[in-house]
């Protein structure tokens, strides 16, 4: 059985949850101190794991509004199967990357086609799925045997700034066509 809970300190979102209560969605109030800018994500997860008893946790971020439920369901199946201890969403980056003023993933004297570069996966905040023991034993949301679920650039849109919001509106308009 799944528990579907929105873990939030702001009770003004409750009216948005009411239409889904008949499908098992519940509001779970979290302490407002967890809203602070100095609070790290792992602190929020630690409190959530203490507040909600479950075998497997699925965390999503509202700042990634284009995440498909099918992506979450497919990644969850990998963890439920026992083949993986966790799963997370990622986009594949296969381009010329730099770090600390130097090429990171290619040799400037032997430039290969981008499609021949080794793919690099970038975590997104679309979702993290993990077994309780992963967090209890390792203190992290990704275990030692994670499944990397590749999402597309639309699902990967993350809204952190006003500019991101404007971009997301353009994506929403495009996807609505």
Predicted regions: what they are:
Residues 149-150, 155-177:
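Hydrophobic helical membrane-anchoring modules
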Residues 1-2:
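Short, small-residue-biased leader/transition segments that mark boundaries at the very start
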Residues 8-9, 129, 159:
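Short beta-strand scaffold positions
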Residues 60-62:
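Active-site acidic Asp-centered loop
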Residues 9-12, 92:
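Residues in the short beta-alpha loop(s) of Rossmann-like NAD(P)-binding domains
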Residues 11-58, 67-74:
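Short phosphate-binding loop-to-helix
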Residues 38, 43-44, 64-155:
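Conserved core of the sugar-phosphate nucleotidyltransferase
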């Amino acid at each position: 059985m799944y528990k579907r809970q929105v873990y939030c300190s702001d009770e003004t979102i409750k009216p948005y949850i009411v239409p889904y209560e008949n499908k098992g969605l519940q509001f779970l109030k979290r302490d407002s101190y967890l809203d602070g800018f100095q609070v790290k994500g792992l602190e929020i997860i630690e409190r959530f794991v203490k507040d909600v008893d479950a075998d497997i946790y699925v965390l999503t971020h509202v700042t990634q509004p284009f995440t498909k439920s099918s992506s979450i369901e497919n990644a969850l199946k990998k963890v439920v199967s026992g083949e993986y201890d966790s799963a997370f969403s990622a986009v594949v980056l296969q381009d010329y990357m730099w770090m600390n003023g130097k090429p990171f993933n290619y040799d400037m004297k032997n430039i290969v086609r981008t499609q021949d570069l080794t793919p690099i996966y970038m975590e997104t905040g679309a979702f993290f799925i993990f077994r309780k023991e992963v967090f209890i034993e390792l203190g992290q949301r990704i275990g030692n045997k994670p499944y990397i679920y590749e999402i597309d650039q639309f699902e990967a849109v993350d809204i952190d700034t006003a500019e991101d919001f404007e971009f997301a509106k353009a994506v929403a308009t495009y996807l609505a066509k």
